[in-house]
Amino acid sequence: MNSFGKRLIMTTFGESHGKAIGCVLDGVPAGLDIDETFIQNELDRRRPGKSKFATARKELDEVQILSGVFEGRSTGTPIAMVIFNKDQKSRDYSNIKDIFRPGHADFTYWHKYGIRDYRGGGRSSARETAARVAAGAVAKLLLKEFGIEVEAGVCEVAGIEAKEFDFDYAKTSEIFALDPYVETLQKEAILKAKEAHDSVGGAVLVRATNLPVGLGEPIYYKLDAVLAEALMSINAAKAVDIGLGREASRLYGSQNNDQITKEGFISNNAGGILGGISNGEDVIAKVWFKPTPSIFQKQRSIDVNGNEVEVELKGRHDPFVAARGSVVAEAMMALVIADMLLLNATSQLSHLKKVYL
Amino acid sequence: MNSFGKRLIMTTFGESHGKAIGCVLDGVPAGLDIDETFIQNELDRRRPGKSKFATARKELDEVQILSGVFEGRSTGTPIAMVIFNKDQKSRDYSNIKDIFRPGHADFTYWHKYGIRDYRGGGRSSARETAARVAAGAVAKLLLKEFGIEVEAGVCEVAGIEAKEFDFDYAKTSEIFALDPYVETLQKEAILKAKEAHDSVGGAVLVRATNLPVGLGEPIYYKLDAVLAEALMSINAAKAVDIGLGREASRLYGSQNNDQITKEGFISNNAGGILGGISNGEDVIAKVWFKPTPSIFQKQRSIDVNGNEVEVELKGRHDPFVAARGSVVAEAMMALVIADMLLLNATSQLSHLKKVYL
Amino acid sequence: MNSFGKRLIMTTFGESHGKAIGCVLDGVPAGLDIDETFIQNELDRRRPGKSKFATARKELDEVQILSGVFEGRSTGTPIAMVIFNKDQKSRDYSNIKDIFRPGHADFTYWHKYGIRDYRGGGRSSARETAARVAAGAVAKLLLKEFGIEVEAGVCEVAGIEAKEFDFDYAKTSEIFALDPYVETLQKEAILKAKEAHDSVGGAVLVRATNLPVGLGEPIYYKLDAVLAEALMSINAAKAVDIGLGREASRLYGSQNNDQITKEGFISNNAGGILGGISNGEDVIAKVWFKPTPSIFQKQRSIDVNGNEVEVELKGRHDPFVAARGSVVAEAMMALVIADMLLLNATSQLSHLKKVYL
Amino acid sequence: MNSFGKRLIMTTFGESHGKAIGCVLDGVPAGLDIDETFIQNELDRRRPGKSKFATARKELDEVQILSGVFEGRSTGTPIAMVIFNKDQKSRDYSNIKDIFRPGHADFTYWHKYGIRDYRGGGRSSARETAARVAAGAVAKLLLKEFGIEVEAGVCEVAGIEAKEFDFDYAKTSEIFALDPYVETLQKEAILKAKEAHDSVGGAVLVRATNLPVGLGEPIYYKLDAVLAEALMSINAAKAVDIGLGREASRLYGSQNNDQITKEGFISNNAGGILGGISNGEDVIAKVWFKPTPSIFQKQRSIDVNGNEVEVELKGRHDPFVAARGSVVAEAMMALVIADMLLLNATSQLSHLKKVYL
């Protein structure tokens, strides 16, 4: 259950403080230029330890491609990528060995598996998302061949909403903020929480541009449904909107419907998806992250024996996870769209005839 | 791509105005009492034509079980269920044969497949959800064996929010309203929109109670992620929250974390899921529906040849889809949880030993 | 676990003496002409009750298409087909209700599920293969668009081997014999066994012609491996050969290797598959069927309570199942190749560019 | 398409002369003791370079576990294992860079993908099977907990058949011969072929003992069908028999049926499988390997430009692949049975109740 996708299938493995994390990406068409620098750059964007807004854990996150690439191009065989863990201060975690940190997966992993790798959250750590970013980078390379681009940025921090959405600006922002005008306020909110040994939540806007019409496989592999799954699978995600999302439910049909002219859709309230299929407009989704559960205040909890304890965490944690989450959201959307691109290639007999006849 | 689930796999088929719709449910453990009356009752709850708040289309939605049940019990083989379409006024749709209705899947199906069954939306019609309700009813029967119950109701109509959540009341309400105190206002909003030939949106709260700890398969079959997919796959759904959802992103970590005592979790902001795995609390999700796209006002659109047209729909449509959507949301959550129950049965070696040794 | 295929996915349902059997075929590209007469003809070829060489059970096997076809063409949505059971003499089976027939699945179904639909073997009956033939017929229609043809015939009965392989002749033979010169002997062997209340086994040769190079997905969806699975899943199948099969293992490498010239491969010992991928030559497989387990002699067995019993079957059974098995083998090979055709459409970036750019 | 299994899912990656080969094994229940020495020993059994009967390529095949194991036990998360390639004499292959070796996958990979990693066969090399053996070793550890054992050995070399099947003896034989009395003849046949720069084929018998009744998921995940797929997916495999296999087709039903007494089945012609489900008897399968295609004689072929060439291979190759193939066959059968064990855990409601209630 550690695989994602139907035709472009990512399988990830690895624990926060194990030997390595990594992924196997199966289904990449042969003949794609695999730009390793680009992949590494994507990982560097997600990498912790770069600013005071994120965890101080310093991982170089150097990715190695083990297979599937020959002379710079994909061969059609699975692309395995591995990142060996370096900065694994496992000692930091010895004190929480038998304790369930509130808001964390400790409690559920323990009960589900009867055992847990407690070091840094083990498999449940957001560190796993580095593997997704590596796979997502390959998906982006594939999408680029078709002119499709996926971008993301932070649109809300602690309730402070972006009014403008400048995806280029986000690329340069330490917190991937989409709106330069509220970025300062947003940063202050993060630092204020950090100083109070607390954390804040936020939201990320993800956008794909230049999609062909037709991506998405009704009824149970709809583009919007799979995007929802993909984004909700990111650590700390608690809500997903497609297009106007929740806001659409407060409009009248006559307001919300995207009417059509010769030039295309007049509006894009739908977020580029109708009936689970892309309509050619920008695909827009929003994912909402809870505040980081790792805070440095005393909290009530229990240990594995059911005894009540007071937890006070040590270690290094992001006071705001949505920033790095935006890089992961991009990766997930890229993977979803690339998968849908492959799936849709056989939707019509005429497509197949172009390939074979 | 018309299948859902990994161990309990529902495959649906059928078009709104074709011969029949139906489903095949594979993976139901043998020995389950299959109460056909219960299944039919579930379908009756979703069935249109019962009140002025829903479409006047009258379908008896009589379900026939074709296989997988012998002498009242499941045999472990696939359970096929079929509902023959009766009230198919296909003529109603001849006028939109070549036209793309705004807000509908007409445009995307046409482009994706190069052909569409235009009668009543064909496969993209919400009629398909009757098949889900039939399958969901079987999932509910399975869950009942373990004391797990899934319930849903409407918590918001046209921005009018429920303050109380009375799931028993919802069962008796024509619009499945959770809050009797706002129900009248909510109904008025629907009727007002209907009279204006318009439609409204809303939201549904779904809840599962009495789950064991451990359901959900990280990393890519997380309970919350799959719920998000399941709920977003319902027609007209545009957003999904788990637990506090979006609201959680506006709290501090110290507020949002569910602390733990000997008696259990102090709060349930997480909606019963940590790290993608059920924690034993109620699983809570919310799904937001856009206003019905089928409205009876003039709208701009184009036809299949790219000519601009004015669309004015006829036919019978719900002015508010979330009510019947709540029955579907229940079915989808039941299917997800039942699937997770089966999957989790092999999470520990000790579980397997209970089965085999 | 009642589904087969990855992109062209057949799900079957139904029991021998239940209400109906049928299938849902998902993934058929839109725009394919669906010739219902052809589908019915395929079913008629498999249909029992036509000669003294097969069971006297008379089923009309009238197939109804419930979905996925509009105005004679596939729409891209799942094609559901159903065959209602007519001639269900359930009384024939009351005497074996609690008994395990030797060579049958009675024993294993009972133990696996704790319950069994004993009427005519229930789900384990070869009657299920009618659903495969319906789905296979659609696969054949798809393959025909690419000039690919799948044919089969009986090449051995009770050890009497065909020396010639005339697939056209097989179409006219009551036992689908490939070799007219040994057909009489083969028929005599069947009738002799039948008279002795016994049964015989045999083998079927299946061939696909005119495949493109490239079908088959290494490493775990190889064309030969999936063919082996497909053919071995047919009732009573006990062995599968690809190309020379077992005989190849008794040659030297220098004899067995298919050398290549400008004109193509000099020989086809490989059966058209190298490394799990089609090489453009005819794909050849052989499937070996055990003698029908249903014989009308006294046999030792036990009942569900563990008591020893003497079984003496009544009812109607084929004395030789491979004949009708050859129709099923064709269907299975057609399904496999069609699935591979769809999968291979995304093997190269250049293929995708043909579809999208 | 590089994954195998439904609940115990092995994904392999890597090329013969790339950086590494490896696998990710997902679905291993938590709490299993992972004996790394045992896994390494299994790899050592398959490892080349140990005798004159196998290729001289010397790989240490040192396996590293990267994830999924904590303090010696499985945690329920994916177990990634990697083997870095050491002895990669890529130069050996430069002369066949543009040439299709007869009997190899060069031709088909080239055409399927438009590119190939020609070094040592790339992905199509039998080197990939080392990853299977690693995964299979974990499956064996799981099966051992339930008393199930899987063993294999060579039963035929160049037409020389074993008459006795001594699985313990096979463990000590350089060619994994099952029958000590014909082993010398079999070895001579291999060496004689080797001296003639040729190769021979053979067959392997695989056996699983002590299975519970009930493993196998009809209709399309039958134990025998999936075994056939698993064994046929091994490099150079061309035929698979279950139980008596082909021989059964030459018996009468009255001879072939395994009659039953209180003490169990009187015979085991079926190879332990009825209706696709294990019946508690030994599961028996045979897999037939073609002679190694890599021979050191002149052969006719073409190059990537279609020019006719004479190929004369250099490099190091097994003159007889079935010996090492027997280790792989064991691994594949272990994986299949372990997967079926997990799947069957939910076949009955009563099983689930044992886990949850």
Curated annotation (Swiss-Prot), chains A, B, C, D:
Q: What is its EC number?
A: 4.2.3.5
What is the required cofactor set for this protein? Answer: FMNH2
Q: Carries keyword Amino-acid biosynthesis?
A: yes
Q: Disulfide bonds, which pairs? A: none
Q: Where does NADP(+) bind?
A: 46
What detail does the entry give on cofactor binding?
Reduced FMN (FMNH(2)).
This protein's pathway reads:
Metabolic intermediate biosynthesis; chorismate biosynthesis; chorismate from D-erythrose 4-phosphate and phosphoenolpyruvate: step 7/7
Decide whether keyword NADP is in the record.
yes
Which positions are annotated as binding FMN? 123-125, 235-236, 275, 290-294, 316
- What biological-process terms (Gene Ontology) are attached? amino acid biosynthetic process; aromatic amino acid family biosynthetic process; chorismate biosynthetic process
What do the Gene Ontology cellular component annotations say?
Answer: cytosol
An example Gene Ontology molecular-function term: chorismate synthase activity
The UniProt entry, under Pfam families, shows: Chorismate_synt
Q: For this UniProt record, give its keywords in alphabetical order, as a comma-separated list.
A: Amino-acid biosynthesis, Aromatic amino acid biosynthesis, FAD, Flavoprotein, FMN, Lyase, NADP
Reactions listed under catalytic activity: 5-O-(1-carboxyvinyl)-3-phosphoshikimate = chorismate + phosphate
Q: Fetch the PANTHER family from UniProt.
A: CHORISMATE SYNTHASE
Recorded family membership: Belongs to the chorismate synthase family.
NCBIfam families reported in the protein's UniProt record:
aroC (TIGR00033), PRK05382.1 (NF003793)
Q: How does it assemble?
A: Homotetramer.
The task this protein performs is described as: This reaction introduces a second double bond into the aromatic ring system.
Q: Which HAMAP family match?
A: Chorismate_synth
What is the protein's name according to its record? Chorismate synthase
> From what organism does this protein derive?
Nitratiruptor sp. (strain SB155-2)
